[in-house]
Amino acid sequence: ASLVTSFEEA
């Protein structure tokens, strides 16, 4: 996962 999707998956 990238730094963008890291909070979207959280």
From Swiss-Prot:
Belongs to the glycosyl hydrolase 16 family. Its EC number is 3.2.1.81. It comes from Agarivorans albus. Disulfide bonds: none annotated. One of its GO terms (molecular function) is beta-agarase activity. Keywords: Glycosidase, Hydrolase, Secreted. GO terms for biological process: carbohydrate catabolic process. This is Beta-agarase AgaA34. Optimum temperature is 40 degrees Celsius. Active at temperatures up to 50 degrees Celsius. Optimum pH is 8.0. Active from pH 6.0 to 10.0.
